[in-house]
Amino acid sequence: MTPGASEAALEALSVRLGLPLAFDDDACSVMVGEQPFAIRRDGPGDRLVVSAIVADDLPDAPSRKLVEDLLNLGFGLMHDGLPAVARDPETGFIAAFAIFAGDRLIAPEFPDAFEKFAAFAQRLTDRLDAERSGYSADSDGGAGEASAADPAGFDIIHV
């Protein structure tokens, strides 16, 4: 990875989206459809954290399947570029995020990785909305569930 990889990756995403993107105090915000994303530089060296709020809070009575799937997403942190999910204890917001460094931060490949993450965040938003409206993956085998070869390319994620 060369110095300035995070800037080059953001520039490549800017070209792909056709939007002017730039870091402001090490962060950048971008809207994709109706979903806001934050992209920020993190830690020593070039590393980007991409995040999106996918729900204001958990559904009141989440299904066991949803809870299991959200817990399984914690393993994304063990692999560069795979998404994970966290809940902000102060606001209750549920956020999806992924950390990109090294080979996952190469400028020509970052826009594809970002698009995969954006698709994942949208699927997770839809899944949480479905649970909140009473449609549970437990009740019929998979509200919004993706297969192991899902179109977003996250082969260990089952959301």
Task: Put a short name on every predicted segment.
Residues 84-116:
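A mid-sequence interfacial segment
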Residues 28, 46-48, 92-94:
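Hydrophobic residues embedded in beta-strands of well-ordered beta-sheets
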Residues 1-38, 78, 86:
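Charge-rich, low-complexity N-terminal segments
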Residues 53-97:
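Short, internal acidic amphipathic alpha-helical interface segments
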Residues 104-137:
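A contiguous, mid-protein "functional segment" used to position or interact
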Residues 129-159:
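Short, highly charged C-terminal tails/helix-capping segments
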Residues 41, 45-56:
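A short acidic-to-branched-hydrophobic micro-motif
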